[in-house]
Protein backbone atom coordinates (compact mmCIF):
# COMPACT_ATOMS: atom_id res chain seq x y z
CA UNK A 1 0.00 0.00 0.00
CA UNK A 2 2.70 2.49 1.01
CA UNK A 3 4.89 1.09 -1.77
CA UNK A 4 2.32 2.28 -4.31
CA UNK A 5 2.29 5.70 -2.64
CA UNK A 6 6.10 5.83 -2.75
CA UNK A 7 6.06 4.94 -6.45
CA UNK A 8 3.67 7.82 -7.10
CA UNK A 9 5.75 10.27 -5.04
CA UNK A 10 8.92 9.38 -6.95
CA UNK A 11 7.86 11.78 -9.69
CA UNK A 12 8.17 14.61 -7.17
CA UNK A 13 11.31 13.44 -5.37
CA UNK A 14 13.70 10.66 -6.33
CA UNK A 15 14.39 9.92 -2.68
CA UNK A 16 11.19 7.90 -2.47
CA UNK A 17 12.86 5.31 -4.71
CA UNK A 18 14.52 3.96 -1.58
CA UNK A 19 11.28 2.14 -0.76
CA UNK A 20 11.88 -0.12 -3.75
CA UNK A 21 14.60 -1.90 -1.76
CA UNK A 22 13.39 -5.19 -0.31
CA UNK A 23 15.78 -5.02 2.63
CA UNK A 24 14.43 -1.65 3.74
CA UNK A 25 10.81 -2.76 3.47
CA UNK A 26 11.68 -5.97 5.31
CA UNK A 27 13.12 -3.93 8.18
CA UNK A 28 10.12 -1.60 8.15
CA UNK A 29 7.90 -4.68 8.24
CA UNK A 30 9.67 -5.84 11.40
CA UNK A 31 9.45 -2.46 13.11
CA UNK A 32 5.83 -1.81 12.15
CA UNK A 33 4.60 -5.19 13.37
CA UNK A 34 6.71 -4.92 16.53
CA UNK A 35 5.32 -1.48 17.40
CA UNK A 36 1.76 -2.57 16.66
CA UNK A 37 1.98 -5.65 18.87
CA UNK A 38 3.66 -3.77 21.73
CA UNK A 39 1.14 -0.93 21.50
CA UNK A 40 -1.98 -3.09 21.12
CA UNK A 41 -0.87 -5.86 23.48
CA UNK A 42 -1.92 -4.29 26.81
CA UNK A 43 -5.29 -3.27 25.36
CA UNK A 44 -5.90 -6.77 23.99
CA UNK A 45 -4.95 -8.42 27.29
CA UNK A 46 -7.34 -6.15 29.21
CA UNK A 47 -10.09 -6.84 26.69
CA UNK A 48 -9.61 -10.61 26.94
CA UNK A 49 -9.65 -10.37 30.74
CA UNK A 50 -12.84 -8.30 30.72
CA UNK A 51 -14.48 -10.83 28.40
CA UNK A 52 -13.23 -13.63 30.69
CA UNK A 53 -11.53 -15.38 27.79
CA UNK A 54 -9.16 -17.45 29.89
CA UNK A 55 -7.21 -20.65 29.40
CA UNK A 56 -8.50 -23.84 31.00
CA UNK A 57 -5.84 -26.20 32.36
CA UNK A 58 -5.90 -30.00 32.38
CA UNK A 59 -5.87 -31.57 35.85
CA UNK A 60 -3.68 -34.47 34.68
CA UNK A 61 -0.84 -32.20 33.55
CA UNK A 62 2.07 -30.75 35.51
CA UNK A 63 0.83 -29.26 38.77
CA UNK A 64 2.74 -26.05 38.10
CA UNK A 65 0.32 -25.35 35.24
CA UNK A 66 -2.68 -25.01 37.53
CA UNK A 67 -1.61 -21.43 38.26
CA UNK A 68 -2.02 -20.66 34.54
CA UNK A 69 -5.77 -21.24 34.69
CA UNK A 70 -7.65 -18.14 33.62
CA UNK A 71 -4.72 -16.56 31.78
CA UNK A 72 -6.11 -14.74 28.72
CA UNK A 73 -5.89 -16.78 25.51
CA UNK A 74 -6.62 -16.16 21.81
CA UNK A 75 -3.76 -13.65 21.85
CA UNK A 76 -2.75 -14.99 18.46
CA UNK A 77 -5.20 -12.44 17.06
CA UNK A 78 -2.67 -9.80 18.11
CA UNK A 79 0.04 -11.55 16.09
CA UNK A 80 -2.12 -11.99 13.00
CA UNK A 81 -3.42 -8.42 13.00
CA UNK A 82 0.12 -7.04 13.37
CA UNK A 83 1.41 -9.27 10.57
CA UNK A 84 -1.51 -8.44 8.32
CA UNK A 85 -1.34 -4.66 8.75
CA UNK A 86 2.44 -4.53 8.38
CA UNK A 87 2.42 -6.75 5.28
CA UNK A 88 -0.34 -4.76 3.61
CA UNK A 89 1.52 -1.52 4.32
CA UNK A 90 4.97 -2.49 3.03
CA UNK A 91 4.62 -5.41 0.59
CA UNK A 92 4.03 -5.25 -3.15
CA UNK A 93 0.33 -6.08 -3.31
CA UNK A 94 0.67 -7.15 -6.95
CA UNK A 95 2.78 -10.11 -5.85
CA UNK A 96 0.80 -13.37 -5.84
CA UNK A 97 3.03 -15.04 -3.24
CA UNK A 98 2.26 -12.32 -0.71
CA UNK A 99 -1.46 -12.95 -1.08
CA UNK A 100 -1.10 -16.75 -0.97
CA UNK A 101 0.86 -16.68 2.30
CA UNK A 102 -1.31 -13.97 3.83
CA UNK A 103 -4.58 -15.73 2.96
CA UNK A 104 -3.36 -19.15 4.13
CA UNK A 105 -2.25 -17.57 7.41
CA UNK A 106 -5.57 -15.83 8.00
CA UNK A 107 -7.69 -18.83 6.94
CA UNK A 108 -5.85 -21.20 9.27
CA UNK A 109 -6.14 -18.53 11.93
CA UNK A 110 -9.91 -18.57 11.37
CA UNK A 111 -9.94 -22.33 12.03
CA UNK A 112 -8.05 -21.75 15.26
CA UNK A 113 -10.34 -18.90 16.24
CA UNK A 114 -13.43 -21.11 15.93
CA UNK A 115 -11.68 -23.83 17.94
CA UNK A 116 -10.70 -21.38 20.69
CA UNK A 117 -14.15 -19.77 20.67
CA UNK A 118 -15.88 -23.08 21.25
CA UNK A 119 -13.47 -23.99 24.05
CA UNK A 120 -13.42 -20.67 25.88
CA UNK A 121 -16.71 -18.93 25.12
CA UNK A 122 -19.04 -21.90 24.63
CA UNK A 123 -17.21 -23.92 27.34
CA UNK A 124 -16.95 -26.91 24.98
CA UNK A 125 -13.79 -28.70 26.12
CA UNK A 126 -13.38 -30.46 22.76
CA UNK A 127 -13.51 -27.23 20.79
CA UNK A 128 -13.96 -27.65 17.07
CA UNK A 129 -14.38 -31.41 16.40
CA UNK A 130 -11.18 -32.91 14.98
CA UNK A 131 -12.88 -34.11 11.81
CA UNK A 132 -14.03 -30.58 11.00
CA UNK A 133 -10.71 -29.05 11.96
CA UNK A 134 -8.81 -31.38 9.61
CA UNK A 135 -11.48 -30.98 6.93
CA UNK A 136 -11.05 -27.22 6.76
CA UNK A 137 -7.28 -27.48 7.08
CA UNK A 138 -7.37 -29.86 4.12
CA UNK A 139 -9.62 -27.58 2.10
CA UNK A 140 -7.36 -24.57 2.59
CA UNK A 141 -4.13 -26.58 2.28
CA UNK A 142 -5.18 -28.31 -0.93
CA UNK A 143 -6.58 -25.03 -2.28
CA UNK A 144 -3.22 -23.30 -1.79
CA UNK A 145 -1.39 -26.29 -3.28
CA UNK A 146 -3.55 -26.38 -6.40
CA UNK A 147 -3.19 -22.63 -6.90
CA UNK A 148 0.61 -22.77 -6.62
CA UNK A 149 0.74 -25.80 -8.93
CA UNK A 150 -1.49 -24.39 -11.65
CA UNK A 151 0.18 -20.96 -11.65
CA UNK A 152 3.80 -22.18 -11.46
CA UNK A 153 5.64 -20.52 -14.37
CA UNK A 154 8.38 -23.16 -14.49
CA UNK A 155 8.93 -26.81 -13.56
CA UNK A 156 11.50 -25.88 -10.92
CA UNK A 157 8.71 -24.45 -8.76
CA UNK A 158 7.13 -27.91 -8.49
CA UNK A 159 10.38 -29.83 -7.97
CA UNK A 160 11.59 -31.20 -4.64
CA UNK A 161 15.07 -29.87 -3.92
CA UNK A 162 17.46 -32.07 -1.95
CA UNK A 163 19.77 -29.84 0.12
CA UNK A 164 23.51 -30.45 0.44
CA UNK A 165 23.56 -32.43 -2.83
CA UNK A 166 24.58 -30.59 -6.00
CA UNK A 167 21.85 -30.56 -8.67
CA UNK A 168 19.81 -33.12 -6.70
CA UNK A 169 16.10 -32.70 -7.28
CA UNK A 170 12.97 -34.77 -7.84
CA UNK A 171 10.30 -33.60 -10.32
CA UNK A 172 7.00 -33.99 -8.50
CA UNK A 173 4.38 -33.25 -11.11
CA UNK A 174 0.93 -33.54 -9.57
CA UNK A 175 2.66 -34.99 -6.48
CA UNK A 176 3.53 -31.38 -5.67
CA UNK A 177 -0.06 -30.88 -4.52
CA UNK A 178 0.19 -33.83 -2.12
CA UNK A 179 3.54 -32.72 -0.69
CA UNK A 180 2.36 -29.14 -0.29
CA UNK A 181 -0.76 -30.28 1.53
CA UNK A 182 1.25 -32.31 4.05
CA UNK A 183 3.82 -29.54 4.56
CA UNK A 184 1.23 -26.82 5.22
CA UNK A 185 -1.15 -28.88 7.35
CA UNK A 186 1.69 -30.72 9.09
CA UNK A 187 3.50 -27.49 9.97
CA UNK A 188 0.28 -25.95 11.24
CA UNK A 189 -0.43 -28.81 13.62
CA UNK A 190 3.21 -29.18 14.67
CA UNK A 191 3.43 -25.58 15.88
CA UNK A 192 0.09 -26.02 17.62
CA UNK A 193 1.39 -29.06 19.52
CA UNK A 194 4.50 -27.12 20.53
CA UNK A 195 2.48 -24.25 21.98
CA UNK A 196 2.24 -25.64 25.50
CA UNK A 197 4.67 -23.54 27.54
CA UNK A 198 5.21 -19.80 27.88
CA UNK A 199 7.13 -18.60 24.82
CA UNK A 200 7.99 -22.12 23.70
CA UNK A 201 6.36 -21.95 20.27
CA UNK A 202 6.69 -18.29 19.36
CA UNK A 203 10.47 -17.96 19.56
CA UNK A 204 11.26 -20.99 17.35
CA UNK A 205 8.60 -19.68 14.95
CA UNK A 206 10.36 -16.31 14.83
CA UNK A 207 13.76 -17.91 14.26
CA UNK A 208 12.56 -20.27 11.53
CA UNK A 209 10.53 -17.47 9.94
CA UNK A 210 13.59 -15.23 9.89
CA UNK A 211 15.70 -17.93 8.25
CA UNK A 212 12.99 -18.55 5.65
CA UNK A 213 13.02 -14.81 4.97
CA UNK A 214 16.70 -15.14 4.04
CA UNK A 215 15.85 -18.00 1.68
CA UNK A 216 13.08 -15.87 0.14
CA UNK A 217 15.44 -12.98 -0.49
CA UNK A 218 18.11 -15.21 -2.04
CA UNK A 219 15.66 -17.27 -4.10
CA UNK A 220 14.08 -14.13 -5.51
CA UNK A 221 17.43 -12.80 -6.76
CA UNK A 222 18.64 -14.57 -9.90
CA UNK A 223 22.33 -13.88 -9.23
CA UNK A 224 22.25 -15.16 -5.65
CA UNK A 225 20.16 -18.16 -6.66
CA UNK A 226 22.57 -19.16 -9.43
CA UNK A 227 25.61 -18.70 -7.19
CA UNK A 228 24.14 -20.72 -4.32
CA UNK A 229 22.59 -23.36 -6.62
CA UNK A 230 19.11 -22.89 -5.21
CA UNK A 231 15.90 -22.53 -7.24
CA UNK A 232 15.29 -19.09 -8.68
CA UNK A 233 11.70 -18.16 -7.83
CA UNK A 234 10.81 -14.77 -9.35
CA UNK A 235 8.86 -12.67 -6.87
CA UNK A 236 9.72 -14.78 -3.83
CA UNK A 237 11.92 -12.02 -2.47
CA UNK A 238 8.82 -9.98 -1.67
CA UNK A 239 8.02 -12.48 1.09
CA UNK A 240 10.85 -10.99 3.13
CA UNK A 241 8.31 -8.31 4.09
CA UNK A 242 5.90 -10.94 5.42
CA UNK A 243 8.72 -12.75 7.23
CA UNK A 244 9.84 -9.45 8.71
CA UNK A 245 6.31 -8.76 9.91
CA UNK A 246 6.21 -12.24 11.44
CA UNK A 247 9.45 -11.56 13.30
CA UNK A 248 8.25 -8.20 14.62
CA UNK A 249 4.81 -9.46 15.62
CA UNK A 250 6.33 -12.55 17.22
CA UNK A 251 8.83 -10.59 19.30
CA UNK A 252 6.14 -8.14 20.33
CA UNK A 253 3.90 -11.00 21.41
CA UNK A 254 6.81 -12.63 23.29
CA UNK A 255 7.02 -9.46 25.39
CA UNK A 256 3.72 -10.51 26.95
CA UNK A 257 4.03 -14.28 26.47
CA UNK A 258 7.39 -14.77 28.16
CA UNK A 259 7.37 -16.71 31.45
CA UNK A 260 5.16 -16.16 33.37
CA UNK A 261 2.84 -15.44 30.46
CA UNK A 262 0.29 -12.64 30.55
CA UNK A 263 -1.44 -14.06 27.47
CA UNK A 264 -1.43 -17.23 25.35
CA UNK A 265 -1.67 -17.26 21.57
CA UNK A 266 -4.20 -20.09 21.42
CA UNK A 267 -5.00 -22.10 18.31
CA UNK A 268 -5.80 -18.91 16.42
CA UNK A 269 -2.10 -18.05 16.50
CA UNK A 270 -0.42 -21.46 16.49
CA UNK A 271 -2.34 -22.98 13.57
CA UNK A 272 -1.87 -19.82 11.50
CA UNK A 273 1.85 -19.39 12.13
CA UNK A 274 2.60 -23.03 11.39
CA UNK A 275 0.68 -22.84 8.12
CA UNK A 276 2.58 -19.66 7.20
CA UNK A 277 5.95 -21.35 7.71
CA UNK A 278 4.89 -24.34 5.63
CA UNK A 279 3.58 -22.20 2.78
CA UNK A 280 6.72 -20.07 2.61
CA UNK A 281 8.94 -23.16 2.60
CA UNK A 282 6.91 -24.61 -0.28
CA UNK A 283 7.18 -21.43 -2.33
CA UNK A 284 10.99 -21.27 -2.06
CA UNK A 285 11.27 -25.07 -2.47
CA UNK A 286 12.88 -25.65 0.93
CA UNK A 287 10.55 -28.19 2.49
CA UNK A 288 13.41 -30.40 3.66
CA UNK A 289 15.26 -27.43 5.15
CA UNK A 290 12.07 -26.50 7.02
CA UNK A 291 12.02 -30.03 8.42
CA UNK A 292 15.58 -29.47 9.68
CA UNK A 293 15.15 -25.96 11.07
CA UNK A 294 11.80 -26.81 12.62
CA UNK A 295 13.27 -29.82 14.39
CA UNK A 296 11.66 -28.83 17.69
CA UNK A 297 8.24 -28.85 16.03
CA UNK A 298 9.03 -32.23 14.46
CA UNK A 299 10.20 -33.63 17.80
CA UNK A 300 7.03 -32.47 19.55
CA UNK A 301 4.85 -34.04 16.85
CA UNK A 302 6.73 -37.33 16.80
CA UNK A 303 6.48 -37.59 20.58
CA UNK A 304 2.67 -37.47 20.30
CA UNK A 305 2.62 -40.00 17.45
CA UNK A 306 4.92 -42.38 19.33
CA UNK A 307 2.96 -41.98 22.57
CA UNK A 308 -0.41 -42.69 20.93
CA UNK A 309 0.91 -45.59 18.83
CA UNK A 310 2.68 -47.20 21.78
CA UNK A 311 -0.35 -46.93 24.05
CA UNK A 312 -2.70 -48.38 21.45
CA UNK A 313 -0.37 -51.25 20.51
CA UNK A 314 1.12 -52.17 23.90
CA UNK A 315 -0.93 -50.30 26.50
CA UNK A 316 2.26 -48.58 27.68
CA UNK A 317 3.41 -44.98 27.43
CA UNK A 318 6.89 -44.13 26.18
CA UNK A 319 6.84 -40.66 27.73
CA UNK A 320 5.43 -39.52 31.04
CA UNK A 321 3.28 -37.14 29.04
CA UNK A 322 3.14 -35.91 25.46
CA UNK A 323 3.99 -33.58 23.79
CA UNK A 324 7.54 -34.10 24.98
CA UNK A 325 7.94 -30.72 26.70
CA UNK A 326 5.52 -31.97 29.37
CA UNK A 327 7.64 -35.12 29.75
CA UNK A 328 10.62 -33.01 30.77
CA UNK A 329 8.48 -30.97 33.14
CA UNK A 330 7.29 -34.14 34.88
CA UNK A 331 10.93 -35.23 35.16
CA UNK A 332 11.51 -32.16 37.30
CA UNK A 333 12.80 -29.60 34.80
CA UNK A 334 11.57 -26.08 35.62
CA UNK A 335 9.46 -24.61 32.83
CA UNK A 336 11.99 -21.86 31.90
CA UNK A 337 14.72 -24.51 31.52
CA UNK A 338 12.63 -26.52 29.07
CA UNK A 339 11.78 -23.38 27.09
CA UNK A 340 15.30 -22.00 26.80
CA UNK A 341 16.83 -25.37 25.95
CA UNK A 342 14.30 -25.86 23.16
CA UNK A 343 15.19 -22.36 21.94
CA UNK A 344 18.88 -23.29 21.94
CA UNK A 345 18.13 -26.43 19.92
CA UNK A 346 16.24 -24.28 17.41
CA UNK A 347 19.16 -21.85 17.09
CA UNK A 348 21.47 -24.75 16.27
CA UNK A 349 19.04 -26.29 13.77
CA UNK A 350 18.40 -22.95 12.05
CA UNK A 351 22.15 -22.49 11.62
CA UNK A 352 22.36 -25.98 10.13
CA UNK A 353 19.52 -25.10 7.77
CA UNK A 354 21.27 -21.91 6.67
CA UNK A 355 24.51 -23.83 6.23
CA UNK A 356 22.85 -25.93 3.52
CA UNK A 357 23.12 -22.85 1.30
CA UNK A 358 26.84 -23.52 0.95
CA UNK A 359 27.12 -27.23 1.67
CA UNK A 360 27.05 -28.98 -1.68
Swiss-Prot record:
Tell me which UniProt keywords the record has, alphabetically: Cell cycle, Cell division, Cell inner membrane, Cell membrane, Cell shape, Cell wall biogenesis/degradation, Magnesium, Membrane, Metal-binding, Peptidoglycan synthesis, Transferase, Transmembrane, Transmembrane helix
Give the main EC class: transferase
The catalysed reaction is: UDP-N-acetyl-alpha-D-muramoyl-L-alanyl-gamma-D-glutamyl-meso-2,6-diaminopimeloyl-D-alanyl-D-alanine + di-trans,octa-cis-undecaprenyl phosphate = di-trans,octa-cis-undecaprenyl diphospho-N-acetyl-alpha-D-muramoyl-L-alanyl-D-glutamyl-meso-2,6-diaminopimeloyl-D-alanyl-D-alanine + UMP
Q: State its location(s).
A: Cell inner membrane
UniProt protein name? Phospho-N-acetylmuramoyl-pentapeptide-transferase
Gene Ontology cellular component terms for the protein in this record: plasma membrane
PANTHER family cross-referenced by the UniProt entry: PHOSPHO-N-ACETYLMURAMOYL-PENTAPEPTIDE-TRANSFERASE, PHOSPHO-N-ACETYLMURAMOYL-PENTAPEPTIDE-TRANSFERASE HOMOLOG
Q: Which GO terms describe its molecular function?
A: metal ion binding; phospho-N-acetylmuramoyl-pentapeptide-transferase activity; UDP-N-acetylmuramoyl-L-alanyl-D-glutamyl-meso-2,6-diaminopimelyl-D-alanyl-D-alanine:undecaprenyl-phosphate transferase activity
| Keyword Lipid biosynthesis applies | no
Q: What does this protein do?
A: Catalyzes the initial step of the lipid cycle reactions in the biosynthesis of the cell wall peptidoglycan: transfers peptidoglycan precursor phospho-MurNAc-pentapeptide from UDP-MurNAc-pentapeptide onto the lipid carrier undecaprenyl phosphate, yielding undecaprenyl-pyrophosphoryl-MurNAc-pentapeptide, known as lipid I.
Question: Which pathway features in its UniProt record?
Answer: Cell wall biogenesis; peptidoglycan biosynthesis
Family membership, please give it: Belongs to the glycosyltransferase 4 family. MraY subfamily.
